[in-house]
């Protein structure tokens, strides 16, 4: 589906038409430049590769420099492919946040905040005896048994244990578009999206 690359600026809130305070996320969406056009005849599928944010030539590998020169654009820091664009695009074309003027809902793909190695309480919601907050023992926050002994003599896959939390690719669907500020390439989306401030996200129609 068509979309854009963007950068998460942060969260704020706006007032709706009926006076309610609505939390929203501000995204700097684009402008993105077409760096490659893939066709069914040549590549086996139709898609458009977009580049976002300039970077210095000295920080770009030679193969990528050749890729950008063929497109006639400056080196880009982030690249992503999108399919099913309604209009025919050519190398070097610029796509702005105005493509979301007619969009009511979008999907956002981002990388969730990395939390490092976490236990079962934070990672899986273990802990406690019911909703007790006082009087419970620390052992109530432990994972408990992870399997039998001589049979099956192993830990089954999917057993909920401590481990790395966050840092995953996350897609949030059907987020409402509250406002498009084309002059500043800003997109206001209702609610939160994955990632920290300054992280790169993909917005799809």
UniProtKB/Swiss-Prot annotation:
The record's SUPFAM superfamilies line, in alphabetical order, gives:
Translation proteins
Q: Has UniProt tagged this entry with the keyword RNA-binding?
A: yes
Any idea which UniProt keywords this protein has?
A: Ribonucleoprotein, Ribosomal protein, RNA-binding, rRNA-binding
Citing just one GO molecular function, the answer is:
rRNA binding
Pfam families in alphabetical order: Ribosomal_L3
InterPro entries associated with the record: Ribosomal_uL3, Ribosomal_uL3_bac/org-type, Ribosomal_uL3_CS, Transl_B-barrel_sf
Lineage top rank: taxon? Bacteria
Q: Which GO terms describe its cellular component?
A: cytosolic large ribosomal subunit
**What biological processes does GO assign it?**
translation
| Subunit structure as annotated in this protein's UniProt entry | Part of the 50S ribosomal subunit. Forms a cluster with proteins L14 and L19.
Function, please? One of the primary rRNA binding proteins, it binds directly near the 3'-end of the 23S rRNA, where it nucleates assembly of the 50S subunit.
The family classification in the record reads: Belongs to the universal ribosomal protein uL3 family.
Protein name from the UniProt record: Large ribosomal subunit protein uL3
Organism listed in the record: Bacteroides thetaiotaomicron (strain ATCC 29148 / DSM 2079 / JCM 5827 / CCUG 10774 / NCTC 10582 / VPI-5482 / E50)
């Amino acid at each position: 589906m068509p979309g854009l690359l963007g950068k998460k600026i942060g969260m704020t809130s706006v007032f709706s038409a009926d006076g309610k305070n609505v939390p929203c996320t501000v995204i700097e969406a684009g402008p993105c430049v077409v760096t490659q056009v893939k066709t069914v005849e040549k590549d086996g599928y139709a898609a458009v590769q977009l580049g976002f944010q300039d970077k210095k030539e000295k920080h770009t590998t030679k193969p990528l420099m050749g890729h950008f020169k063929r497109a006639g654009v400056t080196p880009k820091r982030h690249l992503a492919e999108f399919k099913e664009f309604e209009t025919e695009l050519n190398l070097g074309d610029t796509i702005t946040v105005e493509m979301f003027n007619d969009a009511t809902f979008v999907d956002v793909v981002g990388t969730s905040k990395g939390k490092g190695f976490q236990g079962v309480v934070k990672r899986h919601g273990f802990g406690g005896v019911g909703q007790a907050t006082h009087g419970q023992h620390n052992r109530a926050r432990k994972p408990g048994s992870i399997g039998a002994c001589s049979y099956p003599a192993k830990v089954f896959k999917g057993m909920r244990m401590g481990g790395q939390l966050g840092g995953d690719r996350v897609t949030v669907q059907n987020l409402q578009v509250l406002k498009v500020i084309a002059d500043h390439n800003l997109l206001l989306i209702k609610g939160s999206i994955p990632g920290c401030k300054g992280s790169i996200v993909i917005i799809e129609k």
